[in-house]
Amino acid sequence: MGKGGALSDGVIKKILLSYTYVAIWIFLSFTVIVYNKYILDKKMYNWPFPITLTMIHMAFCSSLAVILIKVFKIVEPVSMSRDTYIRSVVPIGALYSLSLWLSNSAYIYLSVSFIQMLKALMPVAVYSIGVLLKKESFKSETMTNMLSISFGVAIAAYGEAKFDTWGVMLQLGAVAFEATRLVLIQILLTSKGINLNPITSLYYVAPCCLVFLFFPWIFVELPILRETSSFHFDFVIFGTNSVCAFALNLAVFLLVGKTSALTMNVAGVVKDWLLIAFSWSVIKDTVTPLNLFGYGLAFLGVAYYNHCKLQALKAKDAQKKVQQGDEEEAGKLLEERESEAAAKRNETED
């Protein structure tokens, strides 16, 4: 094959690799969600201890992150002072622990399909909190789109066959804490030039989460676990569940590193629809036509929001390229003038 053929082969390999990363991420994300539901649901494995499950994940993930960074040196740790850690990482760790605790708790009360529908509110929460914290500028067009997403989720909630108020409150709380965490990452870390990939995030944040979760665990779940004499720690169940949770973080690292965050958003939409289909067909959760209509409306709003973000990123990149081109042209002109001035000086000396 010629040069063009070799180039085509390279492009095809890159596309296939990207699709492979997407498929791995969807599979692992799907597996972790269904596995957590299986463990926590009283009708399945019947182990309704979301704080303990989250702590097991955090202990396992932080241990492996330390091994990957300190022993195998797969990624370099970020240089961070104690003051920066306390001011920036600790608040993010607190929010992350609350988000995981509440989202895992919701699996006890709500179906997998309905939880995915409620998660469609994430862009609404991120944008609203971003505006409140002056990280995002208020735009009436964007806010109208956010309202359409909220309206779609409200319709889906109205059509939910097994609506549980407490479960909905837990999931909405998880969305609010997660959205605040995402905005604070931009304010406290990204703005300071600190970029954490999923592995370094676990290295710094997971131990912090473990500490924050320990205090509610002592009062909420530990007394019940002590009374449950029949309970024995199943290393196969909790071990494989923790491995899946850590593998998911590695998959995020690969997906964002080799493709883009937008690809992950699109893959997330595919995963949500697959989970809804799985919840309905395998777990036998009830999915009503009103559920699907409401979620479909919210889905269109989220898709439009992602499209607008992509266009904004493209415009920003194009502007950067124009600025770089102008700077290069100005540099060339300056070099030419300096060369001309040097030539004139040489002529005068001669």
Swiss-Prot record:
<feature type="domain" description="EamA">
    <location>
        <begin position="38"/>
        <end position="155"/>
    </location>
</feature>
<feature type="region of interest" description="Disordered">
    <location>
        <begin position="324"/>
        <end position="350"/>
    </location>
</feature>
<feature type="transmembrane region" description="Helical">
    <location>
        <begin position="205"/>
        <end position="225"/>
    </location>
</feature>
<keyword id="KW-0813">Transport</keyword>
<feature type="transmembrane region" description="Helical">
    <location>
        <begin position="112"/>
        <end position="132"/>
    </location>
</feature>
<feature type="transmembrane region" description="Helical">
    <location>
        <begin position="286"/>
        <end position="306"/>
    </location>
</feature>
<protein>
    <recommendedName>
        <fullName>Probable sugar phosphate/phosphate translocator At4g32390</fullName>
    </recommendedName>
</protein>
<keyword id="KW-0472">Membrane</keyword>
<dbReference type="GO" id="GO:0005794">
    <property type="term" value="C:Golgi apparatus"/>
</dbReference>
<feature type="transmembrane region" description="Helical">
    <location>
        <begin position="15"/>
        <end position="35"/>
    </location>
</feature>
<dbReference type="GO" id="GO:0000138">
    <property type="term" value="C:Golgi trans cisterna"/>
</dbReference>
<dbReference type="GO" id="GO:0005768">
    <property type="term" value="C:endosome"/>
</dbReference>
<feature type="transmembrane region" description="Helical">
    <location>
        <begin position="49"/>
        <end position="69"/>
    </location>
</feature>
<feature type="transmembrane region" description="Helical">
    <location>
        <begin position="146"/>
        <end position="166"/>
    </location>
</feature>
<dbReference type="InterPro" id="IPR050186">
    <property type="entry name" value="TPT_transporter"/>
</dbReference>
<dbReference type="Pfam" id="PF03151">
    <property type="entry name" value="TPT"/>
</dbReference>
<feature type="transmembrane region" description="Helical">
    <location>
        <begin position="168"/>
        <end position="188"/>
    </location>
</feature>
<keyword id="KW-0812">Transmembrane</keyword>
<keyword id="KW-0762">Sugar transport</keyword>
<feature type="transmembrane region" description="Helical">
    <location>
        <begin position="263"/>
        <end position="283"/>
    </location>
</feature>
<dbReference type="GO" id="GO:0005886">
    <property type="term" value="C:plasma membrane"/>
</dbReference>
<comment type="similarity">
    <text>Belongs to the TPT transporter family. TPT (TC 2.A.7.9) subfamily.</text>
</comment>
<dbReference type="GO" id="GO:0005802">
    <property type="term" value="C:trans-Golgi network"/>
</dbReference>
<keyword id="KW-1133">Transmembrane helix</keyword>
<dbReference type="InterPro" id="IPR004853">
    <property type="entry name" value="Sugar_P_trans_dom"/>
</dbReference>
<feature type="transmembrane region" description="Helical">
    <location>
        <begin position="89"/>
        <end position="109"/>
    </location>
</feature>
<feature type="transmembrane region" description="Helical">
    <location>
        <begin position="235"/>
        <end position="255"/>
    </location>
</feature>
